[in-house]
């Protein structure tokens, strides 16, 4: 014992002699989020945890302090992070541990997108499904040491998860100090080098399709086969609202050149999905909007979260479904989603916020029959109970609530238009609408009282704003209402002023460090999409010029020898070749850039060749897993089965409007050049097989490009 003690004493003396000089920067003694833009950062600016921004300077301070970084990666649209961070902040012992032992760093994985994408790889390495927020311990070099996804749970469970990892990491650090080793640094660096090599091999081993048109058809067959009308299930779609799949299927139903049976099958699958979704509780009948995901395997019980991007993606998909099906209810739902996004996510700057996911209890959103009867008059209560399919024992299927947590509870859903309900009640639309609005407001007031005050996100977000521009443009195309065109143009003007810094983009309307707020490749893809959408419906040439300028800048920032970089070099901290190929949280960068390429190329403004070569191929893995790559497949559909609208001189205002109202992204438009023989007053429609057709009236144009398939 004495010998051991003497040895420990001598080791301690040596360690003390060789211990590095530790400098604790003043910035680490306080919460450093301050006025950092973004909903996540603003929500934690007053936290007792000394959160620091994700910057090179923060990592340099971690090195000086001889501390590991304790990072939390979250995105504002994913629920759970606020409760997890609150559980940490409300535990004084945990706060002290975090502040005294680590450099705590909060990372918005939506804005710093490459970090958000990395969470998928990290979760896969420990054989866990992707779940945010993610706790990650890192060295000052940005090498992950340990990590764990944190499910939404009680404060005690969050504390236990932190303590377990903290204990392990602390013991490794203590062993290093006692034995004069650098195992933690060396091992994490070696692991990250292996990770770098693995990611590189994965991206370099991609097999590209040599027959993209045929493989496009094969992927559509497979996507359609995932839907089973008997069981009403959509295999591999998961629990998210399937906006991407719906959008692809609806556009495939309208795309000339595809085999008739594929178009017919796609239309039928789309209609069946609408039967499942439109009358479901995924659409909130009280406040509007669509919930982004469901709980379990039924659309009767949503995960009650709404963000701006999910509203807009669903709205655009439904607008395309309405084009294909002519269903009035689909259009009603789509325009309702746009109206809800305007109400819920418009910021004080007149732009749009991403939206903070709410973290309320499920029970607060559900109703018993008695609660409806208490809140409304007997007549109105009877109507709501019948229309929403409410039951005394509840309307949730047993497979959704196997433990009967929500016994006698009902979700609310309305599956018809107000005009249909008015006719069923034998009332005029005007009188029924007044009655409906009065009862809706009463129920909403009761629900809001249960939910309590919900924080509103007022941080203008470039991605959400560009998405809204595209939604307005799509709504104009479907309805022909000029107010939507005016909104699209006005919002894009505002967005360019707020989010463009010279030729580059930023995520927030306020200054932020590049690693926090510089535009990633994904944002450039969204901006190009919005600019091209507006260029299609507006006579102003500046939007096409801006889209081309954005493409040039993106090529300079994100082109590497072999892959499409997600982060510009001056914003990158992680030394990993991260690229965005899969629809992990949203559309993928690969899909957005591919779509921009085909649209610009058909307007005779091609991308830089090295950039174009990264954007145009169709990987075989996208064909084999279509549900995860619907955006890239849609771009391929537009490329391989392209339809080009070439306008001659002097076309009538009516024909010009008809060309503007065609499918924004699937049919490419341009003015005839001097070498093309397009008669004055006419439009030439050029198909992918080389055939063409000249038309002079809106009706002839419609017949040329949008003859719907027959039902199989």
Predicted segments — roles?
Residues 9-10, 20, 32, 36-37, ...:
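Glycan-recognition and catalytic cores of secretory/periplasmic carbohydrate-active enzymes
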Residues 65-69, 100-103, 132-133, 140:
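Loop/turn elements at helix/coil->beta-strand transitions in domains of secreted/extracellular proteins
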Residues 80-82:
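Anionic-ligand anchoring segments at beta-strand to alpha-helix junctions in alpha/beta enzyme folds, i.e.
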């Amino acid at each position: 014992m004495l010998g051991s003690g003497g040895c420990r004493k001598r080791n301690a003396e040596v360690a003390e002699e060789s211990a590095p000089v530790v400098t604790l920067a003043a910035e680490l003694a306080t919460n450093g989020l301050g006025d950092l833009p973004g909903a996540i950062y603003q929500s934690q600016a007053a936290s007792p945890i000394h959160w620091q921004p994700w910057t090179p300077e923060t990592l340099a301070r971690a090195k000086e302090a001889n501390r590991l970084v304790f990072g939390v990666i979250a995105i504002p649209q994913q629920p759970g992070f606020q409760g997890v961070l609150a559980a940490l902040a409300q535990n004084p012992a945990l706060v002290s541990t975090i502040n005294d032992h680590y450099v705590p760093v909060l990372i918005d994985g939506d804005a710093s997108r490459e970090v958000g994408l990395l969470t998928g790889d990290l979760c896969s390495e420990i054989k866990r499904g992707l779940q945010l927020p993610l706790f990650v311990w890192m060295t000052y070099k940005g090498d992950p040491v340990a990590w764990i996804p944190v499910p939404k749970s009680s404060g005690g469970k969050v504390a236990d998860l932190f303590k377990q990892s903290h204990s392990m990491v602390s013991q490794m650090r203590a062993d290093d100090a006692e034995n004069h080793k650098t195992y933690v640094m060396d091992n994490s660096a070696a692991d990250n080098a292996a990770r770098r090599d693995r990611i590189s091999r994965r991206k370099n081993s991609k097999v590209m399709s040599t027959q993209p048109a045929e493989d496009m058809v094969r992927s559509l067959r497979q996507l359609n086969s995932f839907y089973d009308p008997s069981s009403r299930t959509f295999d591999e779609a998961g629990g998210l609202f399937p906006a991407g799949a719906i959008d692809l299927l609806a556009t495939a139903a309208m795309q000339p050149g595809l085999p008739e049976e594929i178009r017919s099958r796609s239309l039928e699958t789309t209609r069946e999905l609408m039967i499942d979704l439109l009358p479901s509780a995924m659409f909130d009948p009280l406040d509007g909007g669509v919930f982004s995901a469901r709980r379990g395997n039924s659309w009767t019980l949503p995960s009650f979260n709404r963000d701006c991007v999910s509203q807009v993606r669903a709205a655009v998909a439904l607008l395309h479904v309405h084009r294909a099906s002519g269903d009035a209810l689909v259009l009603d739902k789509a325009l309702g989603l746009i109206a809800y996004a305007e109400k819920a996510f418009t910021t004080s700057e007149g732009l749009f916020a991403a939206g903070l996911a709410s973290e309320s209890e499920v029970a607060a959103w559900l109703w018993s029959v008695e609660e409806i009867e208490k809140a409304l008059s007997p007549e109105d209560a009877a109507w709501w109970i019948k229309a929403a399919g409410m039951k005394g024992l509840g309307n949730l299927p047993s497979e959704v609530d196997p433990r009967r947590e929500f016994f006698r509870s009902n979700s609310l859903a309305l599956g018809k238009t107000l005009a249909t309900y008015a006719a069923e009640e034998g009332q005029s639309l005007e009188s029924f609408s007044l009655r409906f609005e009065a009862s809706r407001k009463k129920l909403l007031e009761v629900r809001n009282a249960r939910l309590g005050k919900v924080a509103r996100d007022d941080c203008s977000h470039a991605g959400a704003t560009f998405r809204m521009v595209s939604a307005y443009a799509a709504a104009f195309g479907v309805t022909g209402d000029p107010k939507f065109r005016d909104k699209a143009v006005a919002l894009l003007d505002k967005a360019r002023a707020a989010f463009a810094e010279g030729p580059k983009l930023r995520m927030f309307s306020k200054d932020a460090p590049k690693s926090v707020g510089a535009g990633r490749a994904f944002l450039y893809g969204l901006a190009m999409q919005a600019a091209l959408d507006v260029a299609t419906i507006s006579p102003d040439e500046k939007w096409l010029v801006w889209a081309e300028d954005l493409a040039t800048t993106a090529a300079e920032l994100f082109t590497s020898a072999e892959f499409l970089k997600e982060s510009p070099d001056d914003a990158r901290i992680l030394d990993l070749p991260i690229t965005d190929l899969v629809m992990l949280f949203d559309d993928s960068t690969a899909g957005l850039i591919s779509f921009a390429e085909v649209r610009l190329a058909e307007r005779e403004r091609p991308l830089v060749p090295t950039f174009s070569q990264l954007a145009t191929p169709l990987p075989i893995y996208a064909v084999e897993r279509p549900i995860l790559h619907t955006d890239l497949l849609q771009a391929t559909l537009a490329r391989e089965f392209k339809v080009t609208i070439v306008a001659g001189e002097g076309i009538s205002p009516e024909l010009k409007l008809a060309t503007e109202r065609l499918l924004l992204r699937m049919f490419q438009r341009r003015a005839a050049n001097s070498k093309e023989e397009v008669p004055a007053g006419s439009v030439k429609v050029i198909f992918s097989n080389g055939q063409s057709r000249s038309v002079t009236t809106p009706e002839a144009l419609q017949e040329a490009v949008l003859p719907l398939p027959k039902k199989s």
